[in-house]
Amino acid sequence: MRRSMKISAEMYKLLIERTLDGFSVIELRDEFIVIKDSLIDPDEAYKKVYRQILRFIKKGWLNGEGSGRQKRYFQTDTFKALHAEPKSENVDIEIVLNQDYSVLVSERNQYKGELEIVLGEIDEYQSLNIRFPELEPKLITLLDEAKERSACLLGKVNGLTNVLKVLSGQKIVHQKFKTKALLFERT
């Protein structure tokens, strides 16, 4: 009577359905990538199949012959006599976190730069107002517009920072930010 044993779905497809025998780790990795039919990282695929090979050797299901890159792995009689069944495949639920969110970091940095410029503009308007009090009526409008722009930019920076924290799994701590734009008063 044959023993029934569950093995990983990938190894089942590779060793039983595709009847791979006398393979190297690289060959098994390449076949693994083909059956996964996805853009899996070759290094990760290598690690996964190598761990499986070691597990199968430990159970006496595979033997290795040779050394280094020339090492080849063969199915043992024990494995061939084994009634293997595939484990149910894990369904990979990939939240779209694999997307490249570096654009968000770039946008945040751009807004930070713009905020610094606007804050410098506000400082200059205040300085001009002190040096040339007769310009105050004209500077007030410019100062108010710069304050509004700085508040808008600060909101964008904070929003992007919070989103990036959520994506990286950090806890968002709401802080009160004070900027030069919010601290100065009309003189």
From Swiss-Prot:
- How is this protein induced? Expression is repressed by the TCP island-encoded sRNA TarB.
Q: Report keywords, A-Z.
A: DNA-binding, Repressor, Transcription, Transcription regulation
Question: Which GO terms are recorded in the biological process aspect for this UniProt protein?
Answer: negative regulation of DNA-templated transcription
Q: Name one GO molecular function term.
A: DNA binding
Q: Does the keyword Metal-binding apply?
A: no
Sum up the protein's function in the record's words.
Represses the transcription of several genes encoded within the Vibrio 7th pandemic island-1 (VSP-1), including dncV, VC_0176, VC_0178 and VC_0180.
Official protein name in the record: Transcriptional regulator VspR
Native organism? Vibrio cholerae serotype O1 (strain ATCC 39315 / El Tor Inaba N16961)
The record's gene field reads: vspR
